[in-house]
A protein has these predicted regions:
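Glycine-rich nucleophile elbow surrounding the catalytic serine of serine-hydrolase chemistry
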Residues: 70-81
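Hydrolase active-site cap/lid region
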Residues: 79-128
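Alpha/beta-hydrolase-fold catalytic nucleophile elbow
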Residues: 69, 94-95, 159, 197
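Alpha/beta-hydrolase fold nucleophile elbow
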Residues: 60-72
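Alpha/beta-hydrolase-fold serine-hydrolase catalytic core, especially in secreted/extracellular enzymes
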Residues: 86, 125-127, 139, 146, ...
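Cap/lid segment of the alpha/beta-hydrolase catalytic domain
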Residues: 1-57, 100, 104-105
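Solvent-exposed loop/turn segments at secondary-structure junctions
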Residues: 8, 14-18, 73-75, 97-99, ...
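Surface-exposed acidic, glycine/proline-enriched linker/cap segments
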Residues: 31-38, 113-138
Length: 224
């Protein structure tokens, strides 16, 4: 990655909110906004925005060419961060699943549902409205292709694994096809893309290196 002339930076999202259902309300942004109803994924997205604040001040950084990536809960986070910060040129959520790139209204067999996050204890990742739709996933007033479309006309690369049924790769593909209409309307149909692989729920170095090819093509498409 570095040999291609990229700069790599990481974000410690837990400084914005602890990844712990029992303690997160006593950390980070929640100490400033104790009555806040947002989940920790939005708090983590805010942390990415603050990292971008720092990056754009560095002369070594091409501020118009910032890309972000994240896996699983990190994938949910970067999708939201990319949708809400126009300074981010390319967004790459990996295996982000429900609450991320996958649709709630279209799920493959074995995919997570909102109730799954109650079982795992991770419902605190999301806001109260999302949690209130437990057992009513398809009744949410909007679906996640909206987040895809909010990134347009900037670059969006969705990476998924065929065997990661929990993350609903079929729902991600359907969401991307819907969002592509927004890209087409803005004259950037090729700025949204997807790369699927034979594997499970992982964000391996080899995978990150392999997506540099599609990222390079997106860079050309969005002009960075």
């Amino acid at each position: 990655i570095l040999q291609r002339g990229n700069i790599a930076a990481s974000v410690d999202r837990t400084q914005a909110a602890a990844d712990n259902k029992d303690t997160y309300r006593n950390t980070g942004l929640y100490r400033l906004f104790p009555e806040a109803e947002f989940g920790v994924c939005p708090a983590w997205a805010w942390a990415i925005h603050r990292c971008v604040d720092a990056l754009v001040t560095l002369k070594e950084v091409r501020s118009e060419a910032i890309a972000i990536t994240g896996h699983s809960r990190g994938g949910k986070t970067v999708l939201l961060a990319g949708a809400t910060d126009k300074r981010i040129a390319i967004t790459n959520p990996n295996n982000s699943g429900i609450g991320g790139a996958g649709l709630n209204r279209l799920k493959m067999k074995g995919s997570e549902v909102i109730d799954s996050f109650f079982g795992s204890g991770n419902i605190f990742w999301f806001g109260r409205e999302f949690a209130a739709h437990r057992h009513r996933d398809t009744e949410l007033p909007y679906d996640n292709h909206y987040l895809h479309a909010l990134i347009a006309p900037r670059g969006l690369l969705l990476t998924e694994a065929y065997e990661d049924h929990d993350a609903n790769p079929a729902g991600t593909y359907a969401a991307a096809l819907s969002a592509r209409r927004a890209y087409q309307m803005l004259g950037k149909k090729e700025a949204i893309g997807w790369a699927y692989r034979e594997s499970g729920h992982a964000h391996l170095l080899a995978v990150r290196v392999r997506v540099l090819g599609p990222v390079g093509r997106l860079q050309e498409e969005v002009g960075v």
